[in-house]
Amino acid sequence: MREILHITTHMGGGVGKVLSGLLAAFAAEGGDHHELLLLEEPEKRNFFDLLAEAGVAAHVEQDAAKIAEAMARADIVQLEWWHHPRMVRFLLELPPVPARLVLWAHVSGAFYPWLPPAFLRVPQRFVFTSAYSYKNPFWDAAQRTWAKEHAAMVNSVGDFSAEEPRHEAHAGFSVGYVGTLSYAKLHPDFVRFCARVKDICGVFFRLVGDAQNEARIRRDAAPFGLAEQLSFAGYVTDVAAELRRMDVFAYLLNPQHFGTTENVLLEAMNAGLAVVALDQCAEKHLVRHGETGLLVRTPEEFEQALRRLYAHPEERARLGRNARRYIEENFSVGRTAAHLNAVYDAVMKREKTMCDFTGMGKDPHEVFLNFLPPPLREGFAQGSVPKELPEILLGESKSSVRHFARLFPADEMLCGWAREIVQRRGGGAR
């Protein structure tokens, strides 16, 4: 029986759903012993509690020396990576330790947080969660080829319901979205897309997710006269109940978003919903246009898709049936577990080596810079904040400048950049 130690920053959002479903599936299989170590106390305990119910050992540990001891005891160590500054701090503090290291990247690495090619060589096995990562626009041909030959790809799939899809009757035509409401993930022109179809009879837009960006979305929607057609559910634990009350699932993401497997999109497809997503990034590797959903490129194409689906409920039903069958056949926690077991089998054939993360950067601000895509990194080269920054770097979380500065308060460079951003935004900069 192999001892496999998973190290994650937290159990929030999509990662929490994936890890709880995956580790519960491993526990049900028997065989290997999996243990989960968190670097932060869970803010929401729903996924954490699911692990306890499944008999999976999970606890919080922040002492790097104690974690190193656990790593040395394990046969395999799997890092759950999305460039969270708490994980960065742990790796910078980690003493030398021998391990068979697997790094499972829960971000595409195509934009920010970027994946430097050299970082892929640190673990014995680097594992992507989307085929889109192989097409990183800031790698050259040789780097893409190396990734294709040496990095694995395992979709980070959570546990989807096996129940037959149910649709609850409701008034109007419900166009739904579930996920992060920050414009770092949601398309910055989301309300502009919605405005194209606001005259559809009874249409309303149901947004499910933490309400931290609700005021801004409402403000952006006001000029389009959309205020009465926006409905915010806030964070919910029963996503399935929300999906049952939707007619179409509209997944309009920032063209430079960081996502990969997009479990909530797959969950909507599993629920038998007709999905409309942008023809970009990871989404185009998950939705088959015209078969399991619709892919659009512009607000005009989105309008055409929504009007078509409104006018033809039988088309919504066809796409939903196909989507459900596609998820059943191609995306399951069992398949994810099997693919990861194959990775573990390969890694076990190798000897433990000393974990060395010094190549990430010698200082926290250097690590931050090294995981920016090259054009953004060049903008910081003069020591000040570039005038134009993507939304993800301006926020409070999601590995933003201020997020890094909070975790590394002694790093004067990071703190200076954070102060500059706060001053700009206080003066009306966005």
Please identify what each model-predicted range represents:
Residues 37-38, 270, 274-277:
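Short hydrophobic beta-strand element within catalytic cores of glycosyltransferases
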Residues 329, 334, 338-430:
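C-terminal amphipathic helix plus adjacent low-complexity
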Residues 111-116, 121-150, 160-161:
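A short, active-site helix/loop in glycosyltransferases that binds the activated sugar's phosphate group
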Residues 53-57, 217-236:
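Nucleotide-activated donor-binding/catalytic signature segment of Leloir-type glycosyltransferases, i.e.
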Residues 74-76, 244-260, 273:
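Acidic donor-binding loop of glycosyltransferase active sites
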Residues 252-266, 278-285:
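Nucleotide-sugar-dependent
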Residues 16-24, 173, 182-196:
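A conserved mid-protein helix/loop that constitutes part of the nucleotide-sugar donor-binding site
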Residues 289-290, 294-300, 308-313:
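Conserved acidic donor-binding segment of nucleotide-sugar-dependent glycosyltransferases
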